[in-house]
């Protein structure tokens, strides 16, 4: 019985040391994870600010309003349109600000043609 008791005590001691080691490792990793997440969030916010600054330069207020509305209803399409507009601006293919009508035209070109399907009963 005494031998079993010693083994149980040793096993318990090993478990405690291992648990303490794991907790120590997690405590060391946690600040770096938090810091990395903070830096990533900062970079994302900075990129978003740059994107908004470019869009302010190339879109009229009405077009910006339409783009904002589009992003609320269809985020993927709004992001795609933003990236296309920024690409056009950076490549120098935009000569003047894009107004609401031009933005509508660009949106129509981006969206695939919808087929009209009708069901008729015979």
Swiss-Prot record:
GO CC terms in record: cytosol
InterPro entries hit by this protein: DNA_bind_arc, PDCD5-like, PDCD5-like_sf
Region (Disordered): 22-42
Transport among keywords: no
Family annotation (Gene3D superfamilies): PDCD5-like (1.10.8.140)
UniProt keyword terms in alphabetical order: DNA-binding
MF-aspect GO terms: DNA binding
Family statement: Belongs to the PDCD5 family.
PANTHER family documented for this protein: PROGRAMMED CELL DEATH PROTEIN 5
Annotated protein name in UniProt: DNA-binding protein MA_4116
